[in-house]
Amino acid sequence: MDMTVSNQKAESDDGSDIDDAALLQKINSLPIDQSITNSVSLEKHDFQGSDDHDSSTDLSDSTLEDVEGSEWADVSRGRYFGSDPSESIVCHNCKGNGHISKDCPHVLCTTCGAIDDHISVRCPWTKKCMNCGLLGHIAARCSEPRKRGPRVCRTCHTDTHTSSTCPLIWRYYVEKEHPVRIDVSEVRKFCYNCASDEHFGDDCTLPSRSNYPESTAFCEANCPSGNDASNKEFFETRRKEFQLERREQNRNQKSSKQRPFHKPGNSLASRLGSKPKSFKRKHSPPSEENGNLSFHSSDGRKFTKTSKKNRKRKW
C-alpha cells in the first residue's frame, strides 16, 4: 500500500516539472517589445546610481549660478515636475524670490516694518524728545524752546525723577480700545512681601526692600475695576507721603552738616572744669621798613629779613 502512494507522488512531481518547462517555452516563444526592455534597463541604471551618489540631496557646493536650466530640475526640490530656479530661493529680509538676504536691494526696518524708508537705528519710533515729549527727534534737535523749572516725568507725571529714569518704562501697558472691566472680587490678591492673600505687595504695611515711590501693577488702585477717580487719589497720597519723607531726609542731612565744630582743647577743658588758655601767636605779623621785613617774637626780639625785591643777584 505504501509503495503505491509513493509511486503516485513521484508521478505527480514529474508532471508538474513538465508543465513548468512547457510554460517557459511558450513565454520565450512570444515576441519581445523593445520599448519595455529599454524602460526596464533605464530604471535599473537609475537605481544603481542612487546607491553610489544622490545628486538631489547634495546641495552644499551647488549654487544658482553653477546649476541652471535642465540641471536644476534634477537637484531642486521639485525635480519630478520641474521648477523655476528663481522661485526656490527665498530672501529672509523682504520674503522675495530669486535672491538671498545678502543681495537684497530693499531696506527693511525691523521696528516699524517700513520698507525702503529708513533703517532700524534711525526709526522715529525709537527716538523720544525729553523737551516736548514727541517722537521722531531728540532734545538736542528740538525746535521748541527749552523748558526750565521743576523736573516732571512725562510718563507718570511725578516730580521725583525724569522721563529717562522713570521706573514705569519697563512695565508700560498699552490700553485696548474697548477695555473689559472685571469685578474686584474675582481678582486674586497676593502679597510678594509677606505672602498674604488679603492684599497686594504695594499695599503691604510691613517694611519692604522696594524703594520705588510709585505703585506697580501689584496694588489695589491698579485693579481692572479701579480705573476711576479713586486711582488718582491713591497716587496723590503716595506722592505726598514720598515728598514728606524726602523733606525729612534733607532736613536731617542739613542738620548734620551744620553741627558746631568743637576744638579738642575746649572739650578737654570742659571735662576738667577749667577754662582754656588764650592762644598767643609766636610771631607778630611782619611790617615792612626800608624794603625789609621785620618780625617780632613773643619775647620781644626782632628779626629782619630782606625782601625779594631788594635782593641783589649774584650774577
Swiss-Prot record:
Stretches the record annotates as Disordered: 43-68, 244-315
Biased composition regions of type Basic and acidic residues, renumbered to the chain: 43-56
Polar residues composition bias: residue spans: 287-297
UniProt entry keywords in alphabetical sequence: Metal-binding, Nucleus, Phosphoprotein, Repeat, Zinc, Zinc-finger
Disulfide bonds: none
Residues bearing the modification Phosphoserine: S12, S16
Record InterPro entries: Air1/2_Saccharomycetales, TRAMP_AT-DNA-binding, Znf_CCHC, Znf_CCHC_sf
Gene Ontology biological-process entries: nuclear mRNA surveillance of mRNA 3'-end processing; nuclear polyadenylation-dependent CUT catabolic process; nuclear polyadenylation-dependent rRNA catabolic process; nuclear polyadenylation-dependent snoRNA catabolic process; nuclear polyadenylation-dependent snRNA catabolic process; polyadenylation-dependent ncRNA catabolic process; rRNA catabolic process; TRAMP-dependent tRNA surveillance pathway
Zinc fingers classed as CCHC-type: ranges: 89-106, 127-144, 189-206
UniProt GO MF annotations: RNA binding; zinc ion binding
Quaternary structure (record): Component of the TRAMP complex composed of at least cid14, mtr4, and air1.
Family membership noted in the UniProt record: Belongs to the AIR1 family.
Role summary: Component of the TRAMP (TRF4) and TRAMP5 complexes which have a poly(A) RNA polymerase activity and are involved in a post-transcriptional quality control mechanism limiting inappropriate expression of genetic information. Polyadenylation is required for the degradative activity of the exosome on several of its nuclear RNA substrates like cryptic transcripts generated by RNA polymerase II and III, or hypomethylated pre-tRNAi-Met. Both complexes polyadenylate RNA processing and degradation intermediates of snRNAs, snoRNAs and mRNAs that accumulate in strains lacking a functional exosome.
Protein name: Protein air1
